[in-house]
Amino acid sequence: AKGDTRRCGYLMMRGCRGDTTATRAWGFNYEEKKCQQETVICGTGGAPRNAFETKQDCDALCEGYSGPQYSMQEMLQHLKENAKKTG
């Protein structure tokens, strides 16, 4: 629905990271991803986060939101704040 004015964005994560607190806050289990070379974390500031393997998947998800796209810096900030909340 183009009527959704929320913002959406993505963040590339390379390799495998052991920060399970941060990844749990984003609503997925990083271990399941088997530490592939690149994971794209995608979503809005307030909705559950999604982990995809390609940026195209993320673009498809973000198409539903008409707000300006989050920068990677902003996405990183969301990640840190959510990790604190669930930590």
Curated annotation (Swiss-Prot):
The protein's GO terms of the molecular function aspect are:
serine-type endopeptidase inhibitor activity; toxin activity
The record's Gene Ontology cellular component field reads: extracellular region; transport vesicle
What is the tissue specificity?
A: Expressed in salivary glands.
Q: How is it modified after translation?
A: The N-terminus is blocked.
Which compartments does it reside in?
A: Cytoplasmic vesicle, Secretory vesicle; Secreted
Answer yes or no on keyword Zinc-finger: no
Positions of the BPTI/Kunitz inhibitor domain: 8-62
Does the keyword field hold Disulfide bond?
yes
- Covalent S-S links between cysteines: 8-62, 16-42, 35-58
Q: Where is this motif: Cell attachment site?
A: 17-19
Q: Which UniProt keywords apply?
A: Cytoplasmic vesicle, Disulfide bond, Hemostasis impairing toxin, Platelet aggregation inhibiting toxin, Protease inhibitor, Secreted, Serine protease inhibitor, Toxin
Q: What does this protein do?
A: Tick salivary platelet aggregation inhibitor that plays an important part in the anti-hemostatic strategy of ticks. Inhibits platelet aggregation induced by ADP (IC(50)~150 nM), collagen, and platelet activating factor (PAF). Acts by binding to platelet membrane glycoprotein IIb-IIIa (ITGA2B/ITGB3) in a metal ion dependent manner. Does not inhibit aggregation induced by ristocecin, an agonist that aggregates platelets independently from the glycoprotein IIb-IIIa (ITGA2B/ITGB3).
What else does the entry mention about this protein?
The monogrins comprise about 4% of the total salivary gland protein.
Q: Under which name does UniProt file this protein?
A: Monogrin 1
Protein's organism: Argas monolakensis (Mono lake bird tick)
